[in-house]
Curated annotation (Swiss-Prot):
Its main location: cytoplasm. The modification Phosphoserine is found at S34, S49. ARL8 effector that promotes the coupling of endolysosomes to dynein-dynactin for retrograde transport along microtubules. Acts by binding both GTP-bound ARL8 and dynein-dynactin. In nonneuronal cells, promotes concentration of endolysosomes in the juxtanuclear area. In hippocampal neurons, drives retrograde transport of endolysosomes from the axon to the soma. Plays a role in the generation of neuronal polarity formation and axon growth. Implicated in the formation of a single axon by developing neurons. The keyword Cytoplasm applies. This is Protein RUFY3. It comes from Homo sapiens (Human). Keywords: Cell junction, Cell projection, Coiled coil, Cytoplasm, Developmental protein, Differentiation, Lysosome, Membrane, Neurogenesis, Oncogene, Phosphoprotein. Interacts with PAK1. Interacts (via C-terminus) with Ras-related Rab-5 proteins. Interacts (via C-terminus) with Ras-related Rap-2 proteins. Interacts with PIK3CA and PIK3R1. Interacts (via N-terminus) with FSCN1; this interaction induces neuron axon development. Interacts with DBN1. Interacts (via the second coiled coil) with GTP-, but not GDP-bound ARL8A and ARL8B. Interacts with dynactin/DCTN1 and the dynein intermediate chain DYNC1I1/2. Directly interacts with DYNC1LI1. The modification Phosphothreonine is found at T5, T12, T51. GO terms for molecular function: dynactin binding. CDD domains: RUN_RUFY3 (cd17696). Overexpressed in gastric cancer cells and tissues (at protein level). The keyword Membrane applies. Residues 271-362, 422-463 form a coiled coil.
């Protein structure tokens, strides 16, 4: 980037103030924002004169608006990409104090304000992006909930504050991309609020709406009751995206540490899953043991029942044989009563036999179920042993990774110390070099003085020689 100071020999207070203001403010219409990999580059379109110009320059407004749209789109790309990467590395729910998230909302606010028509009120002209956002509930019914919530917030007094609250609630709802796409597709409604060459009316708005889909992977939580959204100043912090020349020194070490931390988090997550699986299997084993105990008790009861039925059947057989024998020996008049008793005994015997068959069938079923449960318990025990072995191996790997992490951290600290020492040595060498350069200049000046004196002496000698002759 070229220097912004005016080429004047004697600065005046007016030019100093203008220079300071220009150094503190970056106008999107005078610079082109481009992306160099993952970094932001600001390239000056033309030389900016910092002295007051009595005749204003006449530039093409369409060109300036197109340049602003391109700059805002590139800023949105960087902001969204940086927010997603930092949120995933952080691995937790984001809140309103998170700096990349604050910058994302600032960039979105600038995108929504670009090319916004000014509405005339009693207090003057007012530009607010709350009007277009209110249209979303007519296009997407799900947005009516957050619009009503924004209107019910007691601390919001200005349309700008309501628009900022709406953006935060839409991000929490993970519907911001859907709402923006629905709004951009209705150009006939947006034309009431935006100029024809505004960002929301051009292709850049659709690109930004597509980029917002990636934000659905992050979780955000905002408490807007105590937050002052009306008086916040939406200034883009370019320092978060400008590349530092010294930032690439520890890239390799940081990448290794990041990879190790990712592996550590993966192993810990796998360990938690395995512990949960082991707990579930242990609960199943306990339940099967209780069921096995219950089945054993039921089997003992069934065996006792079978023994009782066998004894009763033997007794009935003896009684029936005794009755038959007595019928053969007794008089005929008693045979009718004895026949009835015999039929009742046979009926009772048949019922007892059927009951015995049912009990034996149930016993066989209980035995088969017990065998199946024993087989399932053996398989579960084998699975638990395998899981425990895998868990021990993973814990060993985790310990190794932790040791490697400490070793890399120590090496990184040592390398940082070496870099610091080298930088100090380099600064001392530069200081000595500067001193030697100053000494050389003094010697050269002395040499020049001596040459001049020699020339003077030669000329004086030449003048004296003819006089002697």
């Amino acid at each position: 980037m070229s220097a912004l100071t005016p080429p004047t020999d004697m600065p005046t207070p007016t030019t100093d103030k203008i220079t300071q203001a220009a150094m503190e403010t970056i106008y999107l219409c005078k610079f082109r924002v481009s992306m160099d990999g993952e970094w932001l580059c600001l390239r000056e379109l033309d030389d900016i004169s910092l002295t007051p110009d009595p005749e204003p320059t006449h530039e093409d407004p369409n060109y300036l608006m197109a340049n602003e749209r391109m700059n805002l789109m590139n800023m949105a790309k960087l902001s969204i990409k940086g927010l997603i990467e930092s949120a995933l590395n952080l691995g937790r729910t984001l809140d309103s104090d998170y700096a990349p998230l604050q910058q994302f909302f600032v960039v979105m606010e600038h995108c929504l304000k670009h090319g916004l028509k000014a509405k005339k009120t009693f207090l003057g002209q007012n530009k607010s992006f709350w009007g277009p956002l209110e249209l979303v509930e007519k296009l997407v019914p799900e947005a009516a909930e957050i619009t009503a919530s924004v209107k019910d917030l007691p601390g919001l007094k200005t349309p700008v504050g309501r628009g900022r609250a709406w953006l935060r609630l839409a991000l929490m709802q993970k519907k911001l991309s859907e709402y923006m796409k629905a709004l951009i597709n209705k150009k006939e409604l947006l034309s009431e609020f935006y100029e024809p060459n505004a960002l929301m009316m051009e292709e850049e708005g659709a690109i930004i709406a597509g980029l917002l889909v990636g934000l659905n992977v992050i979780d955000a939580n905002f408490c807007m009751k105590g937050e002052d959204l009306d008086s916040q100043v939406g200034v883009i912090d370019f320092s978060m995206y400008l590349k530092d020349g010294n930032s690439s020194k520890g890239t390799e070490g940081d990448g290794q540490i990041t990879a190790i931390l990712d592996q550590k988090n993966y192993v810990e997550e796998l360990n938690r899953h395995l512990n949960a699986t082991v707990n579930n299997l242990q609960a199943k084993v306990d339940a099967l043991e209780k069921s096995n105990t219950k089945l054993t008790e039921e089997l003992a009861v069934a065996n006792n029942r079978i023994i009782t039925l066998q004894e009763e059947m033997e007794r009935v057989k003896e009684e029936s044989s005794y009755i038959l024998e007595s019928n053969r020996k007794g008089p005929k008049q008693d045979r009718t009563a004895e026949g009835q008793a015999l039929s009742e005994a046979r009926k009772h015997l048949k019922e007892e036999t059927q009951l015995r068959l049912d009990v034996e069938k149930e016993l066989e079923m209980q035995i088969s179920m017990r065998q199946e449960m024993e087989l399932a318990m053996k398989m579960l025990e084998k699975d638990v042993c395998e899981k425990q072995d895998a868990l021990v191996s993973l814990r060993q790997q985790l310990d190794d990774l932790r040791a490697l992490k400490h070793e890399l951290a120590f090496k990184l600290q040592s390398s940082d110390l070496g870099v610091k020492q080298k930088s100090e040595l380099n600064s001392r060498l530069e200081e000595k070099t500067n001193q030697m350069a100053a000494t050389i200049k003094q010697l050269e000046q002395s040499e020049k003085d001596l040459v001049k004196q020699a020339k003077t002496l030669n000329s004086a000698a030449n003048k004296l020689i003819p006089k002697h002759h």
